[in-house]
Structure formats: structure tokens, C-alpha cells
């Protein structure tokens, strides 16, 4: 890895460099693990005490920190430390783009596929008929891109990614290992009215529906993804039944996320690990779904809504609402219910005592 000098790194972070700004940095490290050519990350006050006993000569610090008192030779001072970590990690992360642009001889590329300049395509990749791959694409190994799919410039597809038929993806797309974009949706129907339909309508009564076989509804739509979208490891975005499943610009998906058929997600949504969104549900812009949130089918979640971890959304959510619990309700309501439940044993003891006192007085 090439070494970076302090002043160049500070410029990349739009930060202030102080001290010996010509010192070279190899990598970032926590203070207790830092060596003399590392950048110690000590933006939290809890880490400052660890710098003195470390080998670190340079540290990333919050603005206003007295770096001269920490026995450092130089420092980079930032106004918003967590935001600075975005630029810092981008500069220091050399994993994806190492090596010359090339197409591995064990890759299989259809003659009609259009591969723009700057591509790096690893072994055992299979690129189908009519595929369009934008400039500077980086593909790991064992990746498949099915016929007719189009991917914009500066894409990064990690090992084992699967892109289905006729998927449309914008620029600067990142897919972590094992992500699957464009598999068929989970959609089945019975010849006659099923027990599932009866239960949904009556909230519990199967009405003696006879067992039936499930017939497949094929997925004739595809998936359309905007620019600057990231999809985590082993996450799945299913293709639509008739219309496309749609993902807006700037959306970020954690690992193990399931997006059902016909789902429409607005721009800049953040979807955490193990979230499941059932078919034909629409999310507005800037929605955040905490880990293990489940969203039922055919619902609408408004702009800027947020769900806490393990929330189960069974009804529409208004814009700007913060939801928690199963079933999902306003967070403050859910917390009040939780507090009340915690008081319930004491309340029952008080009632029992009142009944006992009343019986004795009679």
C-alpha cells in the first residue's frame, strides 16, 4: 500500500493538519493498536488517554482537542468525526481497485455484451447476451450477469453476485458478496379461495378451506435501481410480477435484506440487516428501517419514517413517524405500554392486598 502524507490526507478530508504534516501514514488504527506509521483514530474523549501509551505519532482528533498535550508529532482535526470517517475510509480502502484493468481468461463474455473501458473482470464471471457494463467496472470472481441487463459506470460487484435478466442499474453501484438482484418474486395462488385469504379477511378464521396446491405466478417485470445504491452481502431484491421492482437513488441495504416483488423504494433510504419488505409495498424518501423490521405487503411507509429494531409494520405509516414494536405503533406509545407492563406485577400485588384487606374488614 502506498503511504500518504498527513497534509494530503487532511486535504482529502477537508480538515486541518497541524504539526509535522509531511509525516507518512500507512493505515488507520485504534490508539492501543497504533504503530508509528499509523493514524490513530481518537475522535472520542474515551480514546485520548490511550494515545500517550501508544506508538502513534499522528492522530485524527476532534476540533478543539489539545493535540500538543498528547505527545504527538502531528494531528488532523475534524469538525464532525463520524462524517470524516467516510472520506478517510474511502481514501485508505484499497481492496477493490488494486491491480491492472483486465479481463481474466476464465471469464465468459457473450460477443454481444458491451464492456466499457477500464473494466476489471475476475475469473469465472459469466456475462450474458446484450449486457451493457459501464466504464471502470470492477467484478470479483464467480459473478453472473444475465441477458439484457445494464449496469452504469464505476460498478463494484464482489464475489458471487448474481444479476438477473434485464435488470437496470445506475452508476456507482456496489454489491457485496452473494447479493442477488432480479430473482423471481415469491408469488403463488390457489385455484379456489385459500385458507390464507380467509384468515387475512377474518383475522383468524380459516372457514374450513380445503387444502389446495399452489400455482406459480411468474415474474414478468424486472428490477430498476438508481445511482449510488449499495446492497449488502446475501441480500435479495426480487423482480416484479408485471411492473419493475424499483429502488431509488442513494439507497443503502445492509446484509441479509429481502425486498419482495413490486416493492418501490424512494431515494436515500437506509435498510438495516434482516429487514424484510413484502410485495407491492411502497417506501417514501429518506426512510430508515431498523434491523429485523418486517413490513407487510401492499402498505405505504411515508417519507422520513423510522422504525426501531424488530418492529413489525402491519399498517400504513405516515410521513415522519417513528415506529416501534409488534404491531408497530408510535415509539412513545410503545414505550409507555412497555413501562406500564413492567409495573403490572406490582399493580397485581396491590390489587391482591386490597382484596385481602377488604375481606378482613368485612
Regions found by a protein language model. Name each.
Residues 41, 102-194, 201-330:
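Structural signal for interior beta-strand "rungs" in well-ordered beta-sheet cores
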Amino acid at each position: 500500500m502506498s503511504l500518504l502524507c498527513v497534509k494530503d490526507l487532511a486535504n482529502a478530508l477537508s480538515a486541518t493538519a497541524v504539526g509535522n504534516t509531511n509525516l507518512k501514514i500507512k493505515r488507520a488504527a485504534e490508539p492501543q493498536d497504533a504503530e508509528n506509521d499509523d493514524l490513530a483514530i481518537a475522535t472520542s474523549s474515551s480514546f485520548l488517554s490511550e494515545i500517550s501509551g501508544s506508538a502513534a505519532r499522528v492522530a485524527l482528533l476532534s476540533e478543539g482537542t489539545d493535540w500538543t498535550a498528547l505527545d504527538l508529532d502531528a494531528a488532523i482535526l475534524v469538525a464532525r468525526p463520524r462524517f470524516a470517517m467516510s472520506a478517510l475510509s474511502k481514501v485508505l480502502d484499497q481492496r477493490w481497485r488494486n491491480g491492472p484493468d483486465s479481463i481474466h481468461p476464465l471469464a465468459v463474455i457473450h460477443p454481444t455484451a458491451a464492456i466499457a473501458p477500464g473494466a476489471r473482470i475476475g475469473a469465472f464471471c459469466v456475462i450474458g447476451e446484450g449486457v451493457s457494463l459501464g466504464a471502470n467496472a470492477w467484478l470479483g470472481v464467480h459473478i453472473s450477469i444475465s441477458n439484457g441487463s445494464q449496469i452504469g459506470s464505476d460498478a463494484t460487484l464482489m464475489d458471487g453476485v448474481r444479476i438477473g435478466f434485464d435488470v437496470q442499474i445506475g452508476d456507482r453501484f456496489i454489491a457485496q458478496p452473494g447479493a442477488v438482484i432480479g430473482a423471481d418474486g415469491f408469488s403463488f395462488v390457489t385455484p379456489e379461495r385459500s385458507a390464507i385469504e380467509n384468515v387475512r379477511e377474518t383475522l383468524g378464521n380459516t372457514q374450513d378451506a380445503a387444502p389446495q396446491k399452489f400455482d406459480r405466478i411468474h415474474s414478468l417485470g424486472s428490477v430498476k435501481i438508481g445511482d449510488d445504491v449499495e446492497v449488502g452481502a446475501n441480500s435479495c431484491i426480487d423482480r416484479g410480477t408485471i411492473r419493475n421492482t424499483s429502488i431509488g437513488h442513494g439507497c443503502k441495504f445492509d446484509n441479509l435484506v429481502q425486498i419482495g416483488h413490486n416493492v418501490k423504494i424512494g431515494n436515500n433510504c437506509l435498510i438495516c440487516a434482516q429487514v424484510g419488505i413484502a410485495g407491492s409495498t411502497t417506501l417514501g424518501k429518506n426512510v430508515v428501517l431498523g434491523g429485523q423490521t418486517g413490513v407487510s405487503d401492499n402498505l405505504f411507509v411515508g417519507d422520513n419514517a423510522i422504525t426501531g429494531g424488530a418492529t413489525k409494520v402491519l399498517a400504513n405509516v405516515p410521513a415522519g413517524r417513528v415506529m416501534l414494536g409488534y404491531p408497530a405503533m408510535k415509539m412513545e406509545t410503545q414505550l409507555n405500554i412497555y413501562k406500564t407492563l413492567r409495573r403490572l406485577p406490582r399493580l397485581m400485588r396491590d390489587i391482591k392486598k386490597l382484596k385481602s384487606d377488604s375481606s378482613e374488614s368485612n
